[in-house]
Swiss-Prot record:
Record bears the keyword Cell inner membrane: no
EC number(s) recorded for this UniProt protein: 2.5.1.75
Entry-linked NCBIfam families: miaA (TIGR00174)
GO molecular function term, any single one: ATP binding
Species in which this protein is naturally found: Shigella flexneri
Name of the featured protein: tRNA dimethylallyltransferase
The protein's required cofactors: Mg(2+)
InterPro entries: Dimethylallyltransferase (IPR039657), IPT (IPR018022), P-loop_NTPase (IPR027417)
Amino acids binding ATP: 17-24
Keywords (A to Z) from UniProt: ATP-binding, Magnesium, Nucleotide-binding, Transferase, tRNA processing
Length: 316
């Protein structure tokens, strides 16, 4: 697309970053100044009843800056990148029609990628194929199926953990149905995002600072009642660790503690470590992202001013 045709597109802002980097605080600050409406880009914040462990914006913050695509699914329900793209595009169109600018804020990089580049057409789920895969897993274990995926699609296997049955099953299902690997099919993009996008990423200047922020926030969550929140989910009886919601960082570790598998101290240690690993993956995504303007979490006023300098003109 030419620069001239891009300039004629409606405007949008991406505010990306690892967990605990200060994205939400910056987005709320920007909403006070720019004619923007916020859309959450987070695969965990979609779930109702999962507030403390997800660092969901509180009632006061949401009053100051409402976020779209929060609390739209029960923890028992799935939500895909395709679901997100459909919903986000609808929200963006609604915001643009009202004469305002969509500001998409979050850390689920797969969602940002799906929105920006579009999604390749993948085969629909096949219950028979899925049942066959699950039967094989029951007989041989998911480790065996992961080795099978490594043989046909090493790129996907490197990205999918052996203990992630949902994604592992889907990758094998796609191959069995289509004869093509998930990697092959996802290299074919769908429709690009019909917006002129200004992209920002916020993170502390050093990994050590980010690790400190992550540990502090995890302890703040515990002090705010995170255990009670997960106990309420645990008591429902219909949730389990094969669900994406319960596999979320922090929730998975607290679930193991409630099941008596690990001690409280071990839960805290694993929760912090898992959050650090998540942040590392998010930063790895962003380091390879084109056209990103980096902001420093430790200098929030400067970060705000840099965003205003880049996008302020579009609000005039």
């Amino acid at each position: 697309m030419s620069d001239i045709s891009k300039a004629s597109l409606p405007k949008a802002i991406f505010l990306m970053g690892p967990t605990a980097s200060g994205k939400t605080a910056l987005a709320i600050e920007l909403r006070k100044i720019l004619p923007v409406e916020l859309i959450s880009v987070d695969s965990v914040l979609i779930y109702k009843g999962m507030d403390i462990g997800t660092a969901k914006p509180n009632a006061e913050e949401l009053l100051a800056a409402p976020h779209r695509l929060l609390d739209i699914r029960d923890p028992s329900q799935a939500y895909s990148a395709a679901d997100f793209r459909r919903d986000a595009l609808a929200e963006m169109a609604d915001i643009t029609a009202a004469g305002r600018i969509p500001l998409l804020v979050g850390g689920t990089m797969l969602y940002f990628k799906a929105l920006l580049e579009g999604l390749s057409p993948l085969p629909s789920a096949d219950p028979e194929v899925r049942a066959r895969i699950e039967q094989q897993a029951a007989e041989q274990g998911w480790e065996s199926l992961h080795r099978q995926l490594q043989e046909v699609d090493p790129v996907a296997a490197a990205r999918i953990h052996p203990n992630d049955p949902q994604r592992l099953s889907r990758a094998l299902e796609v191959f069995f149905i289509s004869g093509k690997t998930l990697t092959e099919l996802t290299q074919t993009s769908g429709d690009a995002l019909p917006y002129q996008v200004h992209q920002f990423a916020i993170a502390p200047a050093s990994r050590e600072l980010l690790h400190q922020r992550i540990e502090q926030r995890f302890h703040q969550m515990l002090a705010s009642g995170f255990e009670a929140e997960v106990r309420a989910l645990f008591a429902r009886g219909d949730l389990h660790t094969d669900l994406p919601s319960i596999r979320c960082v922090g929730y998975r570790q607290m679930w193991s503690y409630l099941e008596g598998e690990i001690s409280y101290d071990e839960m805290v240690y694993r929760g912090v470590c898992a959050t650090r690993q998540l942040a590392k993956r998010q930063i790895t995504w962003l380091r390879g992202w084109e056209g990103v303007h980096w902001l420093d979490s430790e200098k929030p006023e400067q970060a705000r001013d840099e965003v205003l300098q880049v996008v302020g003109a579009i609000a005039g």
